[in-house]
Amino acid sequence: MNIPFSPPHIDDAIIEEVVSALRSGWITTGPRTKLFEQKLAEYCGIQHVECVNSASAGMELALRWFGIGPDDEVIVPAYTYTATAEVVLHCGAKLVLVDVNDDLLIDVDKVRQAITPKTKVIIPVDIVGLPCDYQEILDLVNEPEIRKLFRPANDCQSTLGRILILADAAHSLGAYYQGKHTGAVADISVFSFHAVKNLTTAEGGAICLNLPETFHSESIKKDFNTLSLHGQTKDAFTKTKAGAWRYDVCTIGYKCNMTDVAAAMGLVELARYDQNILPKRKRIFDAYNQAFANDPRFRVPTYVTPTKQSSYHVFTLRVNHITEEQRDLIIVKMAENGVAANVHFIPLPMLTAYKSLGFNIQDYPNAYRQYACEISLPVYYDLSDEQVNEVIRVLKAAVSEVL
């Protein structure tokens, strides 16, 4: 039996909708993208969503919109994928890494210690689908002493009057925090629809706007739309209307719009997300939890609490009392027996690009401790009960062999 890690589910409904988009004669940003944005906004319980070609692009656009650049500081957890940090560096800002808790989420006490008058943005990461402690983070940035530290440099920053909370929600579509969907909690949240995500458009992302009422949400959406299309005031679909060919370029923008072909996939996936996709993933999580929770060799991830519900994106199992080398050997032995496993993620200070910036993993001990014993197990739509049982059997056998 060969069990991959996370292949996408592509069925006839998706193929038919994509073919329909292709046959329509409109394959770039158009009516399907607009409809997908509308449906996502309704799903999250917010007013406006702007779809883009990746979560990375969405996060960078958010930073650019907020005016982030040299002399600014942005706080990011050390335990995340490189995309979260790269967007900060692309803007020329100083990247400030902080450690995480045992649940892999950003340590708010470490965030507090890292805030300076130059801090403009905090990027919490809903790692593997579990929402961060947003109320604690929002309470922190709204503390009078923290607000006094904030030094606005433009109109957006002055209007907000505090540090921006930009959620890297790449993993957490469908998760809940205090009864609200992710996307409706932080000031701005960005989802990913990459091929391995719960909901995929092959490549894609979405910017969810949940800014205070002092901002005009519809106007901000237009700002993001303009930034995503070279700073142009009209997209290609709008220019097809009679007499509407003339446009302006009002700012120096980027090219990161979503296509209607991608949105076609997203519309099919979103329509069945809560009733079909999430329940299947939860069933797999529950099976793994039942198999490992009472075995002292393992520590299962938190995926439901009184205030949080995960999106069931990745099952991050920890194996107790092992070294990084033993963990790697377990993954090799699983592969030799037909089961693909992974690690989420290598902490940023362990990667060459970040070492060269002066980061040292010794400064982030908990990020390393969690990484060194973590194994991510297969979770995907078409994974059968038989295959889940095989993953469990193979992993337990590999651990017994290594230990």
Predicted regions and their residues:
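Phosphate-binding glycine-rich loop
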Residues: W26-E73, V87-C91, L97, I146-L149
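Structural detector of well-ordered beta-strand residues that form the stable sheet scaffold
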Residues: E50, I75, V96, L164-L166, ...
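Conserved active-site segment immediately N-terminal to the catalytic lysine
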Residues: C156-T200, W245-C250, R299
